Amino acid sequence: MNRKNVTRTITAIAVVVLLGWSFFYFSDDTRGYKPVDTSVAITQINGDNVKSAQIDDREQQLRLILKKGNNETDGSEKVITKYPTGYAVDLFNALSAKNAKVSTVVNQGSILGELLVYVLPLLLLVGLFVMFSRMQGGARMGFGFGKSRAKQLSKDMPKTTFADVAGVDEAVEELYEIKDFLQNPSRYQALGAKIPKGVLLYGPPGTGKTLLARAVAGEAGVPFFTISGSDFVEMFVGVGASRVRDLFEQAKQNSPCIIFVDEIDAVGRQRGAGLGGGHDEREQTLNQLLVEMDGFGDRAGVILIAATNRPDILDPALLRPGRFDRQIPVSNPDLAGRRAVLRVHSKGKPMAADADLDGLAKRTVGMTGADLANVINEAALLTARENGTIITGPALEEAVDRVIGGPRRKGRIISEQEKKITAYHEGGHTLAAWAMPDIEPIYKVTILARGRTGGHAVAVPEEDKGLRTRSEMIAQLVFAMGGRAAEELVFREPTTGAVSDIEQATKIARSMVTEFGMSSKLGAVKYGSEHGDPFLGRTMGTQPDYSHEVAREIDEEVRKLIEAAHTEAWEILTEYRDVLDTLAGELLEKETLHRPELESIFADVEKRPRLTMFDDFGGRIPSDKPPIKTPGELAIERGEPWPQPVPEPAFKAAIAQATQAAEAARSDAGQTGHGANGSPAGTHRSGDRQYGSTQPDYGAPAGWHAPGWPPRSSHRPSYSGEPAPTYPGQPYPTGQADPGSDESSAEQDDEVSRTKPAHG
């Protein structure tokens, strides 16, 4: 509700109130009479001070016009009072005895007045209903709750293209095909292919699902409607289904077009999830959505794109082919994707020579595009805070720590004893991890308080991993228990600083036993299954499906794993106690140590052998024959380059060609001056179209076309300065920044899975 409508509503209410007050004020004929007690009126009658009187029989009130005012009437010559029921005759006789002029009025009541008593409150309620409905976004008449709230993007909005997306090439390729189908349908129709009716983007928060939808909107060249899943359900019954019908009706009138529903899980949750009666309104909305997506009605030319963080709770009928033909996972970027994202966000920012983006990409395993964008932005803010002019490597390092652990607590006062305990604790983590053979090397260790932690040691993997062996998970347990072992070894008692380490170790050990089947005693069995009751989103949580004896054995195996890791960490620290003291001293002096400094301190530390106490295969004896070598390993042995160069996908080449053409057109247009509307004179901006009459372009690139649009009657003149129909976008050349990004908007959730510090 804008300011103009608010002013108009307030003015209307004020006018109604003023008219009502004026009506009651001017219709009151008792104005000018002073109210007095009945005894005062009787005194005036008995004192023969009454000139005339009027008895209002219906209201049981007496009006007197006195001959002269006095103190009892405060000098007023007109008084009015009430009299008891049945005393009208006595008053008439008393006034007649004093020779006063007496008149009697019997008010029969006005039909209009009686109607106002009942109608006016009703009108007031209707007015309030209309006002609140407008404030909630209803139609102008106040009864448009069933109208769709979808927004249609216009050409004036900022355009996002596939060139602005990096790190999620698979998702871009899938969506690019839809855009290409809309612009070049003949190539697909010749093969009998049909365009997908629906596309579901799913993945963790911050991976770029909404950004991909914005890129489709900027490149599709057809009308694009966007709406949130929560906009369908309202306080009134039937509103959600009505809005779904209205949305698809608008889409059919503008077909071919695209509808984007963000957070579709708000309306697409599995049916039957109403505990104690259910949420029939949401289910009714979902049923209408299912019918509109694939029912008896015609839905030609309408493509539905939806995004969600929780595809597991969506209704199966919503996910079937014919509704969502294509389901695209949008996951966290890999190493190459993180490099591309960092190049995108660092483009246009002054970066110092020591700002190693490749190294930063290696140290940010598990971060999403939104996290990486936040890292670059935090580094820029930190540089501005220090009045710097270029973003340095230390600023990027501090930005990563801020994103992972929170801001540094500079004002915290720590005693020398607590600082010493923290140094030995973090040193125990670092030394235990350094001596283990199957764990990522420690990149940095610090005792600076940050967020809720007193310090942390960061282990950075050399490459992205999708699998972990049992030895690697045991090494993680040793890493986690290193801090607790150092406290017990040096100070002879533990502290509360290891609470997060114990929690992490317990989680790893229990998952090894109950999920991954890494216990020889319990076997390769998954203990605890998720039941499919849909009352809380499809699952009521994990429930034990094993006996109490098995639960006791699980606890024993978990305890056995943690105790073995604790003992291994203790032995490492005992063997290299002098190295631990040296490391703690360096931490107390410098507070933060990086890989080169750690390598010099741990020069004499040797890798420990793997723990074999859990390598029990029963009667199954592993083979001594080594596994075969991969083509990459064989190529490296032969001295051949690996990995072999992979040809660039066709869609990337098309994106590069279109972007280069668009940039060339803009550079040519910049040399010819500018018109009154801000576009170059004699040329047209990429994405603008002109016909005999004005036609919207919906954020399309120059030269776009789609089936059925523009209308055949439209004539489009050709312009010499306009590029040929191409596909926008541009992959980054070697050594240059890629203009893409895979981060999503800031309203997306930032709770992601990433490498966590071992000590909290």
UniProtKB/Swiss-Prot annotation:
Chief localisation class: membrane
Binding site for Zn(2+): 425, 429, 501
Extracellular topological domain residue ranges: 27-110
Record GO terms (molecular function): ATP binding; ATP hydrolysis activity; ATP-dependent peptidase activity; metalloendopeptidase activity; zinc ion binding
Pfam annotation, one family: AAA_lid_3
Compartment(s): Cell membrane
Low complexity bias (residue ranges): 650-669
Positions contributing to ATP binding: 203-210
Job of this protein: Acts as a processive, ATP-dependent zinc metallopeptidase for both cytoplasmic and membrane proteins. Plays a role in the quality control of integral membrane proteins.
Name this protein carries in UniProt: ATP-dependent zinc metalloprotease FtsH
Lineage, uppermost ranks: Bacteria, Bacillati, Actinomycetota, Actinomycetes, Mycobacteriales
